[in-house]
Amino acid sequence: MAAKTAGGGRWEVVKKGRRPGAGGSGKGGGGDRRALGEANGVWKYDLTPPIQTTSTLYERGFEKIMKRQNKEQVPPPAVEPKKPGNKKQAKKVATLTNQNQKQGRFRSLEEALKALDLADLQKELDKSQSVFSGNPSVWLKDLASYLNYKLQVPPSEPTLSQHPHDYPYSLVSRELRGIIRGLLAKAAGSLELFFDHCLFTMLQELDKTPGESLHGYRICIQAILQDKPKIVTTNLGKFLELLRSHQSRPAKCLTIMWALGQAGFTNLTEGLRVWLGIMLPVLGIKSLSPFAIAYLDRLLLMHPNLTKGFGMIGPKDLFPLLDFAYMPNNSLTPSLQEQLCQLYPRLKVLAFGAKPESTLHTYFPSFLSRATPGCPLEMKKELLRSLTECLMVDPLSTSVWRQLYPKHLSQSSLLLEHLLRSWERIPKKTQKSLQETIQSFKLTNQDLLRKGGGSNQDVVTCDSACKSLLQQARGFQLPWTRLLLLVLVFAIGFLCHDFRSHSSFQASLSGQLLQSSGVLPAGQQACTKIYSYSLQGYSWLEKTLPAWGSHLLTVVRPGLQLAWAHTNATVGFLSAHCASHLAWFGDSLANLFQRLQTQLPDTLNQLLRSLRELLLFLYHSILLPTWHMLLEALAQIQEHCHEACRGEVTWDCMKTQLSEAAHWTWLRLQDTTVAFLDWALAMISQQ
């Protein structure tokens, strides 16, 4: 509270000549409240506009108590020269003060909240609102001061890491939450200044040796940021400057980080803004890194649906995290580094966003530049996985790789070898684009080897990997030409050896085999017939071809000559009058072909994708339910047959059941027909 803050949190003995209103209030409580900037005089810069200074009712109440106690504790004038009496009186007052402090502390926050008198709190707030009706910031400060004064428990560490994320607000009763939220709604325009007041007051209390517990201010901060997280995220630059100004005081830095981090537990986007703007810049500081990583872990654990955080992390944020996670001998301890490694895959998903097929090529250059032969093994594995993902998901990554290839030969050799090892797991579409890219790399390697540019060893390694990849891409193919030639040579050699060893074809094994199988006689007969028919055909052509040829030439020649003349005239006319139109038509046709080549594959792919979705819809919506219904019907029929046949299904039983079913169907059809006829006759008779 303001009065308690001004008084240092203790009752003090006021000497006779001292004015009781010197603690920050005027006479009778009518003075002005100190401005927030004055109360927070520790800061060397003005972060927010000053709040209008005025006293609060709660301060006045404390000042009246202090005045009454001071009047009782100030000795009378006649006894003033007696110093021993003054010392005894001072010791008694100090003892009473310590007892009052001890009585004001509870063993736990649960006990303090149970002992809190909500009626008294509401009464004080009503008084504050009636007296300071035009100053909502006073109401809020009274609320925070009252809660913090009443909720005095043994101090805890600044980040409350042993408690749930919403502690201490999670312990607040429903009635107290209603009071707090109602007052925050009434003073909605002063919430930003109230947040600054709570934060700065907490930091001031940390400067005091027997400082108070700060649960009242913590509860107010959590209540504000549950509904208004942008109070923090719109002023991250201001709070980062504040954090850096207290870098030598870890307790204050952790308190600031805890307070700002409360904005992220209800909204993943705001939480990532706080972490990237406040905690990432201090990652690596020994006293602050554990809380920063623990907060990120808790934030991602509370928001498993990462889609709301897409677009928050960019390349400038992801790659410092990659270096922190995988580079050895950095400012993080091994345990924190391992924890960050476990969080990195989810951070990568957040960075790639909702459309990785159009964004991954922007990450490819940084991934490739880090994949050096000397980088740590775990980092190398992660980089190669990320590079492969870029090539498989974003088609533009291959063109980016082509541009970077001549200046990143050592990194490209590692990636090529990794692609060779994992070629079978790469989709066919990606394999095709990679094959074209590797073919261009092969030409680049030949040019570099011929010119002697770059490191020859890197070029040789890349060239070898490219050749292996191209061979792997083509796959294993049988040399059919060589196999046929080999079979032909083997057959000719076998026949020659067979004929030579048996002196004749009839005596050879081949001849005997062909004779016994009937192939040789059939072949001889076929050859005889072919020969005779060929002779007959030749003789017929020899007789008829000259006569028919001369007759055909006589009939067709005039028409052909006339057509040739008309064709020459038409071509001459077109060449003389339509040359420009023909050129335009040729250009248009070429453009049309080019457009079809570029757009038709996408259209066909879209058509095939739509057809696939239609077939899947038909399968899931019609075919699969129909199939299940058919199976259920067959199961019911089988069960009915078992019941009708008393467990033993025979053909006679099946015939009986089928005849009964047919008879029942026929009767139902007759009944339906008779009913329809009766209805029709009734309708006709009515008309």
Swiss-Prot record:
Annotated function: Critical mediator, in cooperation with CASP4, of endoplasmic reticulum-stress induced apoptosis. Required or the activation of CASP4 following endoplasmic reticulum stress.
Positions annotated with a glycan in the UniProt record: 267, 305
Composition bias, Gly residues: 1-10, 20-29
Pfam families in alphabetical order: TMEM214 (PF10151)
Protein name, as recorded: Transmembrane protein 214
Membrane topology of the entry: Multi-pass membrane protein
Family: Belongs to the TMEM214 family.
Residues passing through the membrane, by range: 475-495, 614-634
Subcellular localization, as worded in the UniProt entry: Endoplasmic reticulum membrane
BP GO terms, sorted: apoptotic process
Chain positions covered by the region annotation Disordered: 1-36, 68-94
GO cellular component terms listed in the entry, alphabetical order: cytoplasmic microtubule; endoplasmic reticulum; endoplasmic reticulum membrane; Golgi apparatus
Keywords: Acetylation, Apoptosis, Endoplasmic reticulum, Glycoprotein, Membrane, Transmembrane, Transmembrane helix
UniProt-listed InterPro entries: TMEM214
Residue positions where N-acetylalanine is found in the record: 2
Subunit relationships: Constitutively interacts with CASP4; required for the localization of procaspase 4 to the ER.
